[in-house]
């Protein structure tokens, strides 16, 4: 069962009374009255990144991937919350310095503000990122039509090439 089937079969009915949730199938929460746009993503070691040898690259990947949900909706990400889970050895002082430096670089590059988060201890590394932006409207996934233009920035498939070469 893929992500969309799982949502439809088990969780979509729980959001029926919340039009801002977009039936849980549009990657963001959008409250038009408050102009609030929110996305949440989780990244797990062994699934979204093979290991934690290069914490700085993992952080760059997860920040950029997380803000892309808002950017794809035509919204500038402004704030983010990050929660991390990992062992003491994986969250060593050396790795924490790399994580902090990488977060700082990404914040400057994309004009983001860290606004909170959480940490916990576990043997595998996992991060959850919540991104927040504000807009009067968004580009909705279900509004795409035949013959609409699609624009791509960067290199297509660069993520998989990087993944295969660096990890």
Language-model features and meaning:
Residues 1-167:
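Helix-biased detector of long, well-ordered alpha-helical tracts
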């Amino acid at each position: 069962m893929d992500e969309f089937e799982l949502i439809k079969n088990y969780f979509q009915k729980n959001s029926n009374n919340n039009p801002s949730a977009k039936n849980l199938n549009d990657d963001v929460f959008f409250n038009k009255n408050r102009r609030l746009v929110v996305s949440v993503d989780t990244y797990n070691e062994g699934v979204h990144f093979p290991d934690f040898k290069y914490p700085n690259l993992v952080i760059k990947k997860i920040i950029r991937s997380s803000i892309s949900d808002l950017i794809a909706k035509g919204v500038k990400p402004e704030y983010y919350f990050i929660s991390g889970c990992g062992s003491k050895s994986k969250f060593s002082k050396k790795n924490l310095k790399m994580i902090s430096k990488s977060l700082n670089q990404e914040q400057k590059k994309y004009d983001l503000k860290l606004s909170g988060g959480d940490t916990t201890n576990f043997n595998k590394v996992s991060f959850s990122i919540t991104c927040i932006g504000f807009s009067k409207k968004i580009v909705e996934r279900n509004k795409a039509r035949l013959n609409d233009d699609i624009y791509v920035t960067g290199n297509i498939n660069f993520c998989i090439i990087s993944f295969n070469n660096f990890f």
